[in-house]
């Protein structure tokens, strides 16, 4: 196991508790830069940055969709390892959506912080072995997920959020 955890926690295989679902997209001829009836926003990694470029696709081609607040992971290249809170819409092939196998087992924000952690990010560096670095769901078979009791997950999330608030306040005063 990566490190010692409290006796009330459990080490789980990532894929036993979470699933990764890669995105999809139709051919570019179906892309529109203007929203219209029967279309949905197709989110790409660039849309979660400072200069989004909206693209819309017919709803019937939106095979992979997210709800607001879902967790998306960047899968390839220079964005590999970035973690996003999704907007409602479709997501493209450069991203993967995190699916919770049991919604009452893991708090979404706890999982979000897990994907930002060295435990995930370090393993991701190990498995991305090509020039166009990337991952697929089977790469997560040997990845571990530390699972505290549900209530403790919220305490961890609160502590992390409090730390970020403090860091932001300090940075603002520099």
Sequence positions of predicted segments:
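Catalytic cores of nucleotide-enabled group-transfer and carboxylate-activating enzymes in metabolic
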Residues: 10-17, 101-114, 142-148
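Sequence-specific dsDNA recognition surfaces
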Residues: 15-31, 39-68
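Short, charged beta-turn/beta-strand-edge "cap" motif at the junction between a beta-strand
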Residues: 77-81
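Short, surface-exposed loop/turn microsegments at beta-strand edges and helix-strand junctions
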Residues: 31-40, 58-67, 82-94, 104, ...
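Generic structural signal for buried aliphatic residues
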Residues: 71-72
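Short coil/turn segments at secondary-structure boundaries
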Residues: 27-35, 126-127, 172
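A short glycine-rich beta-alpha junction/loop motif
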Residues: 76, 89-96, 129-147
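Non-catalytic DNA-recognition/assembly elements of restriction-modification systems
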Residues: 2-25, 150-174
């Amino acid at each position: 196991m990566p490190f010692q955890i409290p006796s009330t926690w459990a080490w789980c295989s990532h894929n036993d508790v979470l699933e990764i679902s890669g995105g999809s997209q139709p051919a570019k001829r179906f892309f529109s830069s203007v929203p219209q009836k029967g279309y949905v926003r197709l989110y790409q990694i660039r849309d979660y940055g400072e200069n989004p470029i909206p693209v819309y696709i017919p709803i019937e081609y939106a095979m992979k969709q997210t709800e607001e607040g879902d967790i998306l992971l960047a899968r390839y290249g220079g964005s590999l390892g970035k973690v996003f809170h999704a907007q409602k819409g479709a997501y493209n092939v450069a991203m993967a959506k995190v699916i919770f196998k049991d919604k009452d087992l893991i708090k979404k924000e706890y999982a979000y912080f897990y994907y930002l952690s060295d435990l995930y990010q370090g393993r991701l560096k190990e498995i991305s072995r090509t020039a166009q670095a990337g991952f697929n769901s089977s790469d997560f078979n040997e990845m571990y997920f530390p699972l505290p009791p549900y209530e403790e997950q919220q305490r961890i999330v609160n502590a992390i959020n409090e730390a970020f608030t403090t860091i932001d306040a300090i940075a603002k005063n520099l």
